[in-house]
């Protein structure tokens, strides 16, 4: 594990770069910053880009990728682009529609990975979070196995090279894996995963099923007031993490990132700062000793920054199993 260009095999024979660049945008950041950050990331060796229909920045990310293809920095096949099916498109007949919207926005012919963003379905329409007159989210009952069959058809049509899931618990993954007539297993489960929520059980489960665990909020969170409790702990200020970082003469962010790579997790990072983006590529220049990995394991407190409270009361809420 010595290079940002390294890829690991997925269970369908495709390969995913071991380090990804996330494209969610906090409210305070202008969308054109996404174009700039994506180009900087490509120039610094990033090839794996994670986005979603929900993020409303796919046009900008696509523009940045295409400009770096046009100037000869990369070829399309060098880039691994992930997008996500939003909850208002879970009906089987709507799955391809959502993916086609992504392809139109990015102006790409296919996505490398298409994943179900959440296991919870919402009523279809143009609004991301449809609500009734009392402000209650309008849930929809769609069998996740039916949604998965439509995802399989997107892969067969060549619109998505690989398909996976996000924010699923083990029980929900089992439903798909045990589905009669299953054609393709999910290649990944993308979940919140960091030192305070190390997802050791989910990681063991995914490894046992040949499913890659992809982590978001890898370095904690951006403290975005729209979804993060401002009283929540600041991960990168953790004294144990900072002491280990000092020992290796690295930043706490690099140690938190290296921890995930050594566990076999594919971490996503996000930054709009050119210096920070370049710094994070140095994660391949050192290795953590086993005693330090154990010390970092000990920081787990099963703490979520993203508790998906907006989906509270949904019968398929994944975190109610915990």
From Swiss-Prot:
| Protein residues bound to substrate | 117, 227
Catalyses:
a 3alpha-hydroxysteroid + NADP(+) = a 3-oxosteroid + NADPH + H(+); a 3alpha-hydroxysteroid + NAD(+) = a 3-oxosteroid + NADH + H(+)
Q: Which InterPro entries does the entry link to? A: AKR (IPR020471), AKR1C (IPR044482), Aldo/ket_reductase_CS (IPR018170), NADP_OxRdtase_dom (IPR023210), NADP_OxRdtase_dom_sf (IPR036812)
Q: Which residue numbers mark the site Lowers pKa of active site Tyr?
A: 84
Q: Cross-referenced CDD domains, in alphabetical order?
A: AKR_AKR1C1-35
The record's top EC class is oxidoreductase
Q: Name one GO molecular function term.
A: steroid dehydrogenase activity
Q: How is its activity regulated?
A: Potently inhibited by the nonsteroidal anti-inflammatory drugs (NSAID).
Q: Where in the cell is it found?
A: Cytoplasm
Q: Which residues bind NADP(+)?
A: 20-24, 50, 166-167, 190, 216-221, 270-280
Query: Cytoplasm as a keyword?
Result: yes
Which catalytic residues are annotated? 55 (proton donor)
Name the chain's protein.
3-alpha-hydroxysteroid dehydrogenase
């Amino acid at each position: 594990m010595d290079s940002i260009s390294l890829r690991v095999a997925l269970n369908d024979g495709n390969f995913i770069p071991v380090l990804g660049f996330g494209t969610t945008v906090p409210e305070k950041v202008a969308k054109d910053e996404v174009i700039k950050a994506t180009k900087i990331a490509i120039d610094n060796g990033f090839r794996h880009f994670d986005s979603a229909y929900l993020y409303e920045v796919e046009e900008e990310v696509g523009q940045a990728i295409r400009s770096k293809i046009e100037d000869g920095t990369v070829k399309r096949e060098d880039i691994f682009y992930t997008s996500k099916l939003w909850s208002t498109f879970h009906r089987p007949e709507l799955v391809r529609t959502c993916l086609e919207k992504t392809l139109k926005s990015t102006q790409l012919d296919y996505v490398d990975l298409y994943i179900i963003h959440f296991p919870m379905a919402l009523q279809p329409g143009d609004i991301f979070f449809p609500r009734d007159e009392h402000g209650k989210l309008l849930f929809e009952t769609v069998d996740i196995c039916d949604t998965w069959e439509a995802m399989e058809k997107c892969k067969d049509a060549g619109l998505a090279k690989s398909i996976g899931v996000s924010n699923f618990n083990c029980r929900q993954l089992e439903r798909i894996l045990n589905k009669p007539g299953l054609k393709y297993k999910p290649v990944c489960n993308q979940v919140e995963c960091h030192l305070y929520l190390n997802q050791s059980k989910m990681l063991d489960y995914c490894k046992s099923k040949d499913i890659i665990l992809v982590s978001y909020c890898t370095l904690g969170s951006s403290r975005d007031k729209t979804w993060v409790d401002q009283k929540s702990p600041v991960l990168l200020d953790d004294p144990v993490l900072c002491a280990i970082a000092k020992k290796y003469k690295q930043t706490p962010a690099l140690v938190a990132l290296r921890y995930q790579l050594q566990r076999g997790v594919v971490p996503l990072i996000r930054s709009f700062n050119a210096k920070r983006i370049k710094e994070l590529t140095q994660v391949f220049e050192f290795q953590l000793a086993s005693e330090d990995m154990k010390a970092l394991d000990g920081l787990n407190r099963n703490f979520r920054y993203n508790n998906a409270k907006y989906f509270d009361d949904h019968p398929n809420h994944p975190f109610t199993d915990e």
